[in-house]
Amino acid sequence: MGGLEQWNWYLDGWIIVAGILCAVSSALLGNFLVLRKMSMLGDAITHAILPGLAAAFMISDSRSSLPMFLGAVIAGILTALFTEWIRGFGKVDEGAAMGVVFTSLFALGLVMIVQAADHVDLDPGCVLYGAIELTPLDTILIAGWEIPRVVAVLSVVLIINLLFVIFFLKELKLSSFDPALATTTGFNATIIHYTLMTLVAITAVASFETVGNILVVAMFVVPPAAAYMLTDRLGIMIALSAVLATIAAVTGHISAITVPHWFGYQSTSTAGMMAVTAGLLFVVAALFGPRHGIVVVFIRRQILAWSILSGDIIALMYRIEERNPQLKPDVSYLREILFSRSISTSLTLRYLTRHAQLSDSNGNYQLTELGRDRARQLVRSHRLWEHYLVEHAGMSAENIHKKAEKLEHFTDRRLREKLNEDTIATDQDPHGRPIPPEEQTN
């Protein structure tokens, strides 16, 4: 028996709840780390709190939660403070400052752990990897309900982070994009910054022992980064990051139970699979995001390239018709002039023929009335731009064709009217060729 057959709603339910609380708490703040280009601060803090944990163990000689929490939070806040101090004092970028601080503090923490190992029951593996699977075993009683301790802690952290984002969204937005302007509007961007850093430290520490370093760092960065690929609006980005974090937590735990059985293994780390799932969600967003997705951008560029090529063919046919109305060029003739690939030219000609802009007579093409109307406006745009570039930009007539050839594809009727108004004489272009009239509309 394996996989979902082993599912226990009490045990697995609390594990998922803990994962969701950690993921959403981290993602809410992670949006502003991503916007400030400080994505790895969460990683720096989760490494740099080791000396705080070790110091708390050495002082209290126990693993009780309160000393651990306080020591780690203090170390996390000091990490943010030291990073800012080194960045300002040393005139280095944020990434270099974080690298100096977290490696130094992490090394110090390891030394302290070694020194404390004989006196304190300290498990570095727990610190690094967490044990979210053990969440249901450590419970407390609240209002007659027995719930896992970490769920109670992370619920408080989530509420605090959510309230902070809701009530200070304007300040966070402004200080993230323009700290100087934020200060001039009446609130201190530095206070907002250090409050954010403090909450990042608290969130990291609250999640650290249960879910470990991997999941905390992943949820600070990956869901916000994925949401950033899906939208340009901050409010939507924050909501999407929370949704993606939730999906990663749920599907990550289910995958940790089911996927290993496909390969003959019993199970794997839930925290690790949650991080992997978040990474897969980012890959999907990076590939198929509606504005910035790699595949979508590629398709959009191909459509634009095809649109430009079809316009170039139509405009070229118009110019050929101007010079020699009897000439009906074939694919090879057009491709040679346009320097385009044979397959691209052939497919575009087929499309233009199918949409009644060109007529095909045994492989020789000529404009239809519909195609001639479109070509006339493209050529008009081209020659108006040539006139404008000579008259207003001071360019010579020999150097304007390539510029106008690009601009003609992004010129609508309104812009043509503006160009027409701004030029002194618009009957002919600088080369003496007639400028076609504007299409009359009813």
List each language-model region with its residue ranges:
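Structured cytosolic domains appended to multi-pass membrane proteins
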Residues: 323-442
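Membrane-interfacial segments at transmembrane helix termini in multi-pass membrane proteins
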Residues: 274-319, 413-436
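Short loop segments and helix-boundary regions at transmembrane helix junctions
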Residues: 31-122, 227-242, 246, 254-268
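Helix-loop-helix "hairpin" substructures at the membrane interface of multi-pass membrane proteins
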Residues: 146-218
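Hydrophobic alpha-helical segments embedded in the membrane of multi-pass proteins
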Residues: 24, 47-48, 103-104, 191-202, ...
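Membrane-interfacial amphipathic/re-entrant helices at transmembrane-helix boundaries
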Residues: 1-24
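Transmembrane helix-bundle core of multi-pass membrane transporters
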Residues: 106-163
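Hydrophobic alpha-helical transmembrane segments
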Residues: 16-21, 69-74, 96-100, 151-156, ...
